Amino acid sequence: MGKFCLYFCLIYILFSASSGNPSRCTLFIGASSYHSDPCGSDHPRCTWRLDLFSLTRDQSLSPPCPDLVTYSQYHRPYSLYVFPHWITKPNRRGLGYYSASYSDPCAIQCPYLGCQSWTCPYTGPVSSPHWKYSSDLNFTQEVSSISLHLHFSKCGSSFSFLLDAPGYDPVWFLSSQATQAPPTPAPLIQDSDLQHILEPSIPWSSKILNLILLTLKSSNYSCMVCVDRSSLSSWHVLYDPLKAPNPPDPKAQSILRPSLAIPASNVTPPFPWTHCYRPLLQAISSEHCNNSVVLPPFSLSPLPNVSRPRKRRAVPIAIWLVSALAAGTGIAGGVTGSLSLASSKSLLREVDQDIDHLTQAIVKNHDNILRVAQYAAQNRRGLDLLFWEQGGLCKAIQEQCCFLNISNTHVSVLQERPPLEKRVITGWGLNWDLGLSQWAREALQTGITLLALFLLLIVVGPCVIRQLQALPSRLQHRSQPYSLLNYETNL
Protein backbone atom coordinates (compact mmCIF):
# COMPACT_ATOMS: atom_id res chain seq x y z
CA MET A 1 0.00 0.00 0.00
CA GLY A 2 2.84 2.35 0.79
CA LYS A 3 4.52 1.71 -2.55
CA PHE A 4 1.24 2.34 -4.35
CA CYS A 5 0.84 5.72 -2.60
CA LEU A 6 4.45 6.61 -3.43
CA TYR A 7 3.92 5.78 -7.12
CA PHE A 8 0.68 7.74 -7.14
CA CYS A 9 2.41 10.81 -5.66
CA LEU A 10 5.22 10.63 -8.21
CA ILE A 11 2.75 10.37 -11.11
CA TYR A 12 0.77 13.31 -9.72
CA ILE A 13 3.91 15.45 -9.38
CA LEU A 14 5.06 14.65 -12.92
CA PHE A 15 1.62 15.32 -14.35
CA SER A 16 1.27 18.64 -12.53
CA ALA A 17 4.75 19.70 -13.64
CA SER A 18 4.05 18.85 -17.27
CA SER A 19 0.64 20.57 -17.28
CA GLY A 20 1.78 23.71 -15.48
CA ASN A 21 2.24 27.17 -16.89
CA PRO A 22 4.43 27.32 -19.99
CA SER A 23 7.93 28.65 -19.45
CA ARG A 24 9.75 31.24 -21.54
CA CYS A 25 13.07 33.06 -21.73
CA THR A 26 13.33 36.75 -20.84
CA LEU A 27 16.01 39.15 -22.11
CA PHE A 28 17.11 42.00 -19.85
CA ILE A 29 18.77 45.18 -21.16
CA GLY A 30 19.07 48.18 -18.89
CA ALA A 31 15.85 48.36 -16.86
CA SER A 32 13.68 46.73 -19.55
CA SER A 33 12.78 43.12 -20.23
CA TYR A 34 11.62 41.33 -23.36
CA HIS A 35 9.73 38.03 -23.14
CA SER A 36 10.09 35.36 -25.78
CA ASP A 37 7.39 33.12 -27.19
CA PRO A 38 6.52 30.15 -24.96
CA CYS A 39 9.46 27.71 -24.97
CA GLY A 40 10.90 24.98 -22.79
CA SER A 41 12.25 21.45 -22.88
CA ASP A 42 9.46 20.30 -25.19
CA HIS A 43 9.79 23.32 -27.48
CA PRO A 44 13.42 24.48 -27.00
CA ARG A 45 13.43 27.31 -29.56
CA CYS A 46 12.84 30.73 -27.95
CA THR A 47 12.03 33.57 -30.36
CA TRP A 48 12.13 37.35 -29.98
CA ARG A 49 11.31 40.16 -32.41
CA LEU A 50 13.44 43.11 -31.27
CA ASP A 51 13.76 46.71 -32.39
CA LEU A 52 17.35 48.02 -32.23
CA PHE A 53 16.32 51.62 -31.60
CA SER A 54 14.24 50.50 -28.59
CA LEU A 55 17.20 48.48 -27.31
CA THR A 56 19.42 51.56 -27.62
CA ARG A 57 16.96 53.70 -25.65
CA ASP A 58 16.61 51.04 -22.95
CA GLN A 59 20.38 50.66 -22.58
CA SER A 60 20.94 54.44 -22.39
CA LEU A 61 18.80 54.59 -19.23
CA SER A 62 20.99 52.04 -17.43
CA PRO A 63 24.26 51.41 -19.34
CA PRO A 64 26.46 48.47 -18.28
CA CYS A 65 29.55 50.72 -18.35
CA PRO A 66 29.50 54.31 -16.99
CA ASP A 67 31.15 55.89 -20.06
CA LEU A 68 29.51 53.73 -22.73
CA VAL A 69 28.94 55.76 -25.90
CA THR A 70 25.41 55.68 -27.31
CA TYR A 71 25.26 55.02 -31.03
CA SER A 72 21.68 56.04 -31.84
CA GLN A 73 22.83 58.90 -34.09
CA TYR A 74 25.66 56.86 -35.59
CA HIS A 75 23.91 53.79 -37.03
CA ARG A 76 20.60 55.39 -38.01
CA PRO A 77 21.51 56.24 -41.67
CA TYR A 78 23.20 52.88 -42.33
CA SER A 79 22.06 49.31 -42.77
CA LEU A 80 22.78 47.29 -39.65
CA TYR A 81 24.63 43.97 -39.59
CA VAL A 82 24.24 42.54 -36.12
CA PHE A 83 25.64 39.32 -34.64
CA PRO A 84 26.82 38.12 -31.21
CA HIS A 85 30.35 39.22 -30.37
CA TRP A 86 31.75 35.71 -29.92
CA ILE A 87 31.33 34.83 -33.61
CA THR A 88 34.40 34.69 -35.81
CA LYS A 89 34.49 36.92 -38.88
CA PRO A 90 31.62 35.62 -41.06
CA ASN A 91 31.37 35.24 -44.81
CA ARG A 92 28.71 37.73 -45.84
CA ARG A 93 26.05 36.33 -48.14
CA GLY A 94 23.62 38.82 -49.61
CA LEU A 95 22.80 41.97 -47.65
CA GLY A 96 22.46 40.97 -44.01
CA TYR A 97 22.41 37.18 -43.60
CA TYR A 98 25.39 35.30 -42.22
CA SER A 99 26.72 31.79 -42.00
CA ALA A 100 29.33 31.75 -39.25
CA SER A 101 31.18 29.38 -36.95
CA TYR A 102 31.24 30.01 -33.21
CA SER A 103 34.13 30.43 -30.82
CA ASP A 104 33.94 30.88 -27.06
CA PRO A 105 32.39 34.15 -25.91
CA CYS A 106 34.44 36.93 -24.35
CA ALA A 107 33.71 38.44 -20.97
CA ILE A 108 32.59 42.07 -20.66
CA GLN A 109 35.07 44.51 -19.11
CA CYS A 110 34.55 48.19 -18.25
CA PRO A 111 35.46 50.74 -19.39
CA TYR A 112 34.47 49.45 -22.81
CA LEU A 113 37.03 50.62 -25.39
CA GLY A 114 35.41 49.10 -28.46
CA CYS A 115 36.55 46.16 -30.53
CA GLN A 116 36.64 44.82 -34.05
CA SER A 117 33.77 42.63 -35.19
CA TRP A 118 35.93 39.52 -35.44
CA THR A 119 38.05 39.94 -32.28
CA CYS A 120 37.51 40.62 -28.59
CA PRO A 121 40.53 42.63 -27.36
CA TYR A 122 40.89 43.86 -23.78
CA THR A 123 38.37 41.34 -22.43
CA GLY A 124 38.58 38.66 -19.81
CA PRO A 125 39.01 34.89 -20.08
CA VAL A 126 36.63 32.44 -21.66
CA SER A 127 33.64 31.71 -19.43
CA SER A 128 31.09 29.76 -21.51
CA PRO A 129 31.10 26.50 -23.49
CA HIS A 130 31.06 26.11 -27.26
CA TRP A 131 27.87 27.23 -29.06
CA LYS A 132 26.67 26.13 -32.48
CA TYR A 133 25.18 28.56 -34.96
CA SER A 134 22.45 26.36 -36.44
CA SER A 135 20.96 24.92 -33.22
CA ASP A 136 21.93 27.17 -30.27
CA LEU A 137 21.51 30.64 -31.75
CA ASN A 138 20.61 32.18 -35.09
CA PHE A 139 18.86 35.29 -36.33
CA THR A 140 17.67 37.31 -39.32
CA GLN A 141 17.91 41.09 -39.51
CA GLU A 142 16.12 43.70 -41.63
CA VAL A 143 17.44 47.27 -41.22
CA SER A 144 16.51 48.08 -37.58
CA SER A 145 14.51 44.95 -36.66
CA ILE A 146 15.97 41.59 -35.68
CA SER A 147 14.39 38.18 -35.09
CA LEU A 148 16.45 36.26 -32.51
CA HIS A 149 16.22 32.49 -31.92
CA LEU A 150 17.93 31.06 -28.82
CA HIS A 151 18.02 27.48 -27.58
CA PHE A 152 16.30 27.14 -24.21
CA SER A 153 19.33 25.33 -22.75
CA LYS A 154 21.40 28.51 -23.33
CA CYS A 155 18.89 30.72 -21.52
CA GLY A 156 20.54 32.14 -18.39
CA SER A 157 23.75 33.45 -20.00
CA SER A 158 24.81 36.94 -21.07
CA PHE A 159 25.81 37.99 -24.56
CA SER A 160 26.01 41.09 -26.70
CA PHE A 161 25.31 42.35 -30.21
CA LEU A 162 27.78 44.34 -32.30
CA LEU A 163 27.46 46.44 -35.42
CA ASP A 164 29.73 45.21 -38.23
CA ALA A 165 31.82 48.38 -38.67
CA PRO A 166 35.59 48.96 -38.41
CA GLY A 167 36.77 50.71 -35.25
CA TYR A 168 34.48 51.14 -32.26
CA ASP A 169 31.42 48.95 -32.71
CA PRO A 170 27.95 49.87 -31.41
CA VAL A 171 27.21 47.28 -28.76
CA TRP A 172 24.14 46.06 -26.86
CA PHE A 173 24.72 44.01 -23.69
CA LEU A 174 21.90 41.57 -22.87
CA SER A 175 21.35 38.95 -20.20
CA SER A 176 18.80 36.14 -20.30
CA GLN A 177 16.87 34.22 -17.65
CA ALA A 178 14.23 31.49 -17.73
CA THR A 179 10.87 32.73 -16.42
CA GLN A 180 7.32 31.44 -16.10
CA ALA A 181 4.42 32.94 -18.02
CA PRO A 182 1.69 34.47 -15.81
CA PRO A 183 -1.49 32.43 -15.46
CA THR A 184 -4.01 32.93 -18.23
CA PRO A 185 -7.49 33.83 -16.95
CA ALA A 186 -10.62 32.44 -18.50
CA PRO A 187 -11.80 34.38 -21.55
CA LEU A 188 -14.57 36.90 -20.94
CA ILE A 189 -15.77 36.81 -24.57
CA GLN A 190 -18.13 34.06 -25.61
CA ASP A 191 -18.75 32.83 -29.14
CA SER A 192 -22.23 34.32 -29.06
CA ASP A 193 -20.74 37.82 -28.70
CA LEU A 194 -19.10 37.51 -32.11
CA GLN A 195 -22.31 36.82 -34.01
CA HIS A 196 -23.12 40.54 -34.21
CA ILE A 197 -19.77 41.23 -35.90
CA LEU A 198 -20.00 38.33 -38.33
CA GLU A 199 -23.40 39.37 -39.71
CA PRO A 200 -22.94 40.69 -43.30
CA SER A 201 -25.89 43.08 -43.00
CA ILE A 202 -24.34 45.03 -40.11
CA PRO A 203 -22.56 48.25 -41.28
CA TRP A 204 -18.81 48.50 -40.88
CA SER A 205 -18.95 51.30 -38.30
CA SER A 206 -21.15 49.23 -36.00
CA LYS A 207 -18.89 46.20 -36.45
CA ILE A 208 -15.77 48.14 -35.44
CA LEU A 209 -17.43 49.71 -32.40
CA ASN A 210 -18.60 46.30 -31.21
CA LEU A 211 -15.13 44.90 -31.84
CA ILE A 212 -13.66 47.58 -29.57
CA LEU A 213 -16.25 46.85 -26.87
CA LEU A 214 -15.44 43.15 -26.99
CA THR A 215 -11.73 43.91 -26.84
CA LEU A 216 -12.26 45.94 -23.67
CA LYS A 217 -13.92 42.91 -22.09
CA SER A 218 -11.06 40.60 -23.02
CA SER A 219 -8.38 40.04 -20.38
CA ASN A 220 -6.60 36.98 -21.76
CA TYR A 221 -3.63 36.71 -24.10
CA SER A 222 -5.82 35.82 -27.09
CA CYS A 223 -7.28 39.33 -27.19
CA MET A 224 -8.73 40.47 -30.50
CA VAL A 225 -6.60 43.64 -30.64
CA CYS A 226 -2.94 43.03 -29.81
CA VAL A 227 -0.82 45.97 -28.63
CA ASP A 228 2.87 46.15 -29.49
CA ARG A 229 4.87 47.79 -26.70
CA SER A 230 7.50 49.18 -29.07
CA SER A 231 4.90 51.23 -30.98
CA LEU A 232 2.94 52.72 -28.08
CA SER A 233 4.59 56.13 -28.52
CA SER A 234 3.06 56.57 -31.99
CA TRP A 235 -0.49 55.53 -31.09
CA HIS A 236 -3.35 57.68 -29.83
CA VAL A 237 -6.15 57.65 -27.28
CA LEU A 238 -9.48 56.30 -28.44
CA TYR A 239 -12.02 58.91 -27.30
CA ASP A 240 -12.02 62.66 -26.62
CA PRO A 241 -15.41 64.38 -26.10
CA LEU A 242 -13.89 67.89 -26.08
CA LYS A 243 -12.94 67.85 -29.78
CA ALA A 244 -15.25 67.48 -32.73
CA PRO A 245 -14.29 65.15 -35.58
CA ASN A 246 -12.75 66.80 -38.60
CA PRO A 247 -12.23 64.10 -41.24
CA PRO A 248 -10.68 65.08 -44.58
CA ASP A 249 -13.65 63.63 -46.46
CA PRO A 250 -17.08 65.13 -45.54
CA LYS A 251 -18.71 61.76 -46.25
CA ALA A 252 -16.22 59.84 -44.10
CA GLN A 253 -17.23 58.71 -40.63
CA SER A 254 -14.58 59.28 -37.99
CA ILE A 255 -14.30 56.25 -35.73
CA LEU A 256 -11.10 56.97 -33.78
CA ARG A 257 -10.01 60.53 -33.17
CA PRO A 258 -6.26 61.23 -32.83
CA SER A 259 -6.11 62.92 -29.45
CA LEU A 260 -4.15 62.63 -26.22
CA ALA A 261 -6.81 63.91 -23.81
CA ILE A 262 -8.65 61.90 -21.16
CA PRO A 263 -12.47 62.19 -21.08
CA ALA A 264 -13.79 64.70 -18.59
CA SER A 265 -15.27 63.33 -15.38
CA ASN A 266 -18.68 64.94 -15.96
CA VAL A 267 -19.05 63.42 -19.45
CA THR A 268 -20.36 59.90 -19.80
CA PRO A 269 -17.96 58.05 -22.11
CA PRO A 270 -19.38 55.65 -24.69
CA PHE A 271 -17.01 52.86 -23.56
CA PRO A 272 -16.16 51.37 -20.15
CA TRP A 273 -12.86 52.99 -19.16
CA THR A 274 -12.25 50.48 -16.37
CA HIS A 275 -10.05 48.32 -18.64
CA CYS A 276 -6.48 49.29 -19.40
CA TYR A 277 -3.33 47.87 -20.96
CA ARG A 278 -0.70 46.53 -18.55
CA PRO A 279 2.82 46.61 -20.12
CA LEU A 280 4.22 44.18 -17.54
CA LEU A 281 1.56 41.58 -18.30
CA GLN A 282 1.34 42.57 -21.99
CA ALA A 283 -2.46 42.23 -21.87
CA ILE A 284 -5.62 44.22 -21.18
CA SER A 285 -6.47 44.02 -17.49
CA SER A 286 -9.90 44.36 -15.88
CA GLU A 287 -8.54 46.28 -12.88
CA HIS A 288 -9.56 49.89 -12.34
CA CYS A 289 -7.25 52.43 -13.98
CA ASN A 290 -7.37 55.99 -15.28
CA ASN A 291 -5.87 55.62 -18.73
CA SER A 292 -7.69 55.02 -21.98
CA VAL A 293 -7.62 52.41 -24.70
CA VAL A 294 -4.71 52.85 -27.11
CA LEU A 295 -5.53 52.20 -30.76
CA PRO A 296 -4.37 53.67 -34.08
CA PRO A 297 -6.65 56.39 -35.56
CA PHE A 298 -8.49 55.68 -38.79
CA SER A 299 -11.71 56.59 -40.61
CA LEU A 300 -14.11 54.83 -42.97
CA SER A 301 -14.83 56.36 -46.38
CA PRO A 302 -17.44 55.18 -48.92
CA LEU A 303 -16.16 53.46 -52.02
CA PRO A 304 -16.23 55.60 -55.20
CA ASN A 305 -18.81 54.83 -57.85
CA VAL A 306 -17.64 52.33 -60.43
CA SER A 307 -17.49 53.94 -63.87
CA ARG A 308 -19.74 52.51 -66.57
CA PRO A 309 -18.08 50.37 -69.25
CA ARG A 310 -17.35 52.19 -72.48
CA LYS A 311 -19.16 51.10 -75.63
CA ARG A 312 -17.11 49.75 -78.49
CA ARG A 313 -17.13 51.82 -81.63
CA ALA A 314 -16.30 50.72 -85.13
CA VAL A 315 -12.91 51.81 -86.42
CA PRO A 316 -12.98 53.44 -89.90
CA ILE A 317 -11.30 51.52 -92.70
CA ALA A 318 -8.91 54.41 -93.30
CA ILE A 319 -7.38 53.80 -89.90
CA TRP A 320 -6.71 50.15 -90.81
CA LEU A 321 -5.00 51.26 -94.02
CA VAL A 322 -2.83 53.79 -92.20
CA SER A 323 -2.00 51.18 -89.55
CA ALA A 324 -0.87 48.72 -92.23
CA LEU A 325 1.39 51.32 -93.82
CA ALA A 326 2.77 52.29 -90.40
CA ALA A 327 3.44 48.62 -89.62
CA GLY A 328 5.43 48.22 -92.82
CA THR A 329 7.42 51.34 -92.05
CA GLY A 330 7.99 50.13 -88.48
CA ILE A 331 9.28 46.76 -89.68
CA ALA A 332 11.76 48.46 -91.96
CA GLY A 333 12.87 50.81 -89.19
CA GLY A 334 13.19 47.95 -86.70
CA VAL A 335 15.35 45.95 -89.08
CA THR A 336 17.58 48.97 -89.67
CA GLY A 337 17.90 49.65 -85.94
CA SER A 338 18.71 46.02 -85.17
CA LEU A 339 21.42 45.98 -87.81
CA SER A 340 22.97 49.14 -86.40
CA LEU A 341 22.86 47.67 -82.87
CA ALA A 342 24.53 44.48 -84.06
CA SER A 343 27.34 46.46 -85.62
CA SER A 344 28.11 48.12 -82.25
CA LYS A 345 28.76 44.85 -80.41
CA SER A 346 32.50 45.16 -80.75
CA LEU A 347 32.30 48.62 -79.18
CA LEU A 348 30.39 47.18 -76.20
CA ARG A 349 33.15 44.63 -75.64
CA GLU A 350 35.79 47.34 -75.49
CA VAL A 351 33.70 49.41 -73.05
CA ASP A 352 33.07 46.31 -70.91
CA GLN A 353 36.80 45.65 -70.65
CA ASP A 354 37.42 49.24 -69.54
CA ILE A 355 34.70 48.93 -66.88
CA ASP A 356 36.26 45.67 -65.66
CA HIS A 357 39.65 47.37 -65.22
CA LEU A 358 38.02 50.27 -63.34
CA THR A 359 36.14 47.85 -61.05
CA GLN A 360 39.35 46.03 -60.16
CA ALA A 361 41.05 49.33 -59.38
CA ILE A 362 38.15 50.42 -57.12
CA VAL A 363 38.19 47.09 -55.25
CA LYS A 364 41.94 47.36 -54.64
CA ASN A 365 41.55 50.92 -53.35
CA HIS A 366 38.69 49.76 -51.10
CA ASP A 367 40.90 47.02 -49.63
CA ASN A 368 43.64 49.58 -48.99
CA ILE A 369 41.15 51.85 -47.19
CA LEU A 370 40.06 48.92 -45.00
CA ARG A 371 43.67 48.27 -44.03
CA VAL A 372 44.18 51.94 -43.20
CA ALA A 373 41.00 51.87 -41.06
CA GLN A 374 42.31 48.86 -39.16
CA TYR A 375 45.64 50.58 -38.53
CA ALA A 376 43.81 53.71 -37.32
CA ALA A 377 41.62 51.63 -35.01
CA GLN A 378 44.68 49.96 -33.49
CA ASN A 379 46.34 53.34 -32.93
CA ARG A 380 43.13 54.66 -31.39
CA ARG A 381 42.99 51.77 -28.93
CA GLY A 382 46.63 52.28 -28.07
CA LEU A 383 45.97 55.95 -27.26
CA ASP A 384 42.94 54.94 -25.19
CA LEU A 385 45.15 52.60 -23.17
CA LEU A 386 47.59 55.45 -22.54
CA PHE A 387 44.73 57.68 -21.32
CA TRP A 388 42.97 54.84 -19.45
CA GLU A 389 42.88 56.67 -16.11
CA GLN A 390 41.36 59.78 -17.73
CA GLY A 391 38.54 57.82 -19.41
CA GLY A 392 40.04 57.46 -22.88
CA LEU A 393 41.45 59.75 -25.56
CA CYS A 394 38.25 61.64 -26.37
CA LYS A 395 37.54 62.45 -22.74
CA ALA A 396 41.14 63.50 -22.14
CA ILE A 397 41.25 65.97 -25.04
CA GLN A 398 37.58 66.94 -24.41
CA GLU A 399 36.53 66.49 -28.01
CA GLN A 400 33.77 64.54 -29.69
CA CYS A 401 34.73 61.02 -30.73
CA CYS A 402 34.76 60.36 -34.47
CA PHE A 403 33.95 56.99 -35.97
CA LEU A 404 34.58 55.62 -39.44
CA ASN A 405 32.02 53.44 -41.18
CA ILE A 406 33.12 51.76 -44.42
CA SER A 407 30.31 50.01 -46.26
CA ASN A 408 31.11 47.02 -48.46
CA THR A 409 27.65 46.95 -50.00
CA HIS A 410 28.38 49.15 -53.01
CA VAL A 411 31.63 47.33 -53.80
CA SER A 412 29.93 43.92 -53.63
CA VAL A 413 27.12 45.14 -55.87
CA LEU A 414 29.69 46.50 -58.33
CA GLN A 415 31.46 43.14 -58.44
CA GLU A 416 28.23 41.18 -58.92
CA ARG A 417 26.98 43.20 -61.90
CA PRO A 418 26.86 41.14 -65.13
CA PRO A 419 28.92 42.16 -68.18
CA LEU A 420 27.74 45.14 -70.19
CA GLU A 421 27.12 43.01 -73.26
CA LYS A 422 24.62 40.82 -71.38
CA ARG A 423 22.85 43.84 -69.90
CA VAL A 424 22.43 45.64 -73.25
CA ILE A 425 21.96 42.79 -75.74
CA THR A 426 19.75 40.14 -74.14
CA GLY A 427 17.21 38.90 -76.70
CA TRP A 428 17.44 37.22 -80.09
CA GLY A 429 15.67 40.15 -81.71
CA LEU A 430 18.57 42.45 -80.87
CA ASN A 431 21.45 39.97 -81.04
CA TRP A 432 22.39 39.12 -84.62
CA ASP A 433 25.54 37.25 -83.68
CA LEU A 434 24.05 33.80 -82.89
CA GLY A 435 27.58 32.35 -82.99
CA LEU A 436 27.70 32.61 -86.82
CA SER A 437 30.54 33.74 -89.03
CA GLN A 438 30.69 37.16 -90.67
CA TRP A 439 29.36 36.04 -94.11
CA ALA A 440 26.52 34.07 -92.47
CA ARG A 441 25.44 37.11 -90.43
CA GLU A 442 25.48 39.30 -93.55
CA ALA A 443 23.46 36.72 -95.50
CA LEU A 444 20.91 36.52 -92.67
CA GLN A 445 20.58 40.29 -92.51
CA THR A 446 20.17 40.52 -96.30
CA GLY A 447 17.52 37.81 -96.29
CA ILE A 448 15.51 39.51 -93.55
CA THR A 449 15.71 42.83 -95.42
CA LEU A 450 14.48 41.20 -98.67
CA LEU A 451 11.67 39.50 -96.76
CA ALA A 452 10.55 42.84 -95.32
CA LEU A 453 10.59 44.42 -98.80
CA PHE A 454 8.64 41.44 -100.19
CA LEU A 455 5.97 41.85 -97.53
CA LEU A 456 5.74 45.55 -98.32
CA LEU A 457 5.40 44.69 -102.03
CA ILE A 458 2.58 42.26 -101.29
CA VAL A 459 0.71 44.95 -99.39
CA VAL A 460 1.16 47.73 -101.98
CA GLY A 461 1.47 45.63 -105.21
CA PRO A 462 -2.22 44.83 -105.84
CA CYS A 463 -3.17 48.50 -105.67
CA VAL A 464 -0.44 49.46 -108.15
CA ILE A 465 -1.41 46.65 -110.60
CA ARG A 466 -5.06 47.68 -110.60
CA GLN A 467 -4.11 51.26 -111.31
CA LEU A 468 -1.86 50.21 -114.23
CA GLN A 469 -4.61 48.02 -115.74
CA ALA A 470 -7.14 50.85 -115.65
CA LEU A 471 -4.72 53.41 -117.16
CA PRO A 472 -5.27 52.53 -120.98
CA SER A 473 -9.02 52.77 -120.72
CA ARG A 474 -8.78 56.13 -119.02
CA LEU A 475 -6.39 57.44 -121.71
CA GLN A 476 -8.68 56.22 -124.52
CA HIS A 477 -11.59 57.91 -122.89
CA ARG A 478 -9.74 61.23 -122.90
CA SER A 479 -8.62 61.02 -126.67
CA GLN A 480 -12.25 60.89 -128.02
CA PRO A 481 -14.32 63.09 -125.82
CA TYR A 482 -17.01 63.56 -128.56
CA SER A 483 -18.44 61.07 -131.22
CA LEU A 484 -19.81 61.95 -134.79
CA LEU A 485 -23.55 61.56 -135.30
CA ASN A 486 -23.56 60.87 -139.14
CA TYR A 487 -20.59 60.80 -141.56
CA GLU A 488 -22.79 61.41 -144.73
CA THR A 489 -24.35 64.64 -143.64
CA ASN A 490 -22.80 67.93 -142.89
CA LEU A 491 -24.54 68.19 -139.64
From Swiss-Prot:
- Which keywords does UniProt give here? Cleavage on pair of basic residues, Coiled coil, Disulfide bond, Fusion of virus membrane with host cell membrane, Fusion of virus membrane with host membrane, Glycoprotein, Host cell membrane, Host membrane, Host-virus interaction, Lipoprotein, Membrane, Palmitate, Signal, Transmembrane, Transmembrane helix, Viral attachment to host cell, Viral envelope protein, Viral penetration into host cytoplasm, Virion, Virus entry into host cell
**Annotated InterPro entries:** TLV/ENV_coat_polyprotein
Motif CXXC: which residue numbers?
223-226
Question: Topological domains (Extracellular): residue ranges?
Answer: 21-444
Any ranges marked Cytoplasmic in the topology annotation, and which?
Answer: 466-491
Name any one Pfam family assigned in the record: TLV_coat
Any transmembrane segments, and where?
445-465
Q: How does it assemble?
A: The mature envelope protein (Env) consists of a trimer of SU-TM heterodimers attached by a labile interchain disulfide bond.
What is the protein name stated in its UniProt record? Envelope glycoprotein gp63
Q: Supply the source organism for this entry.
A: Human T-cell leukemia virus 3 (strain 2026ND)
Lineage, uppermost ranks: Viruses, Riboviria, Pararnavirae, Artverviricota, Revtraviricetes
Protein's gene: env
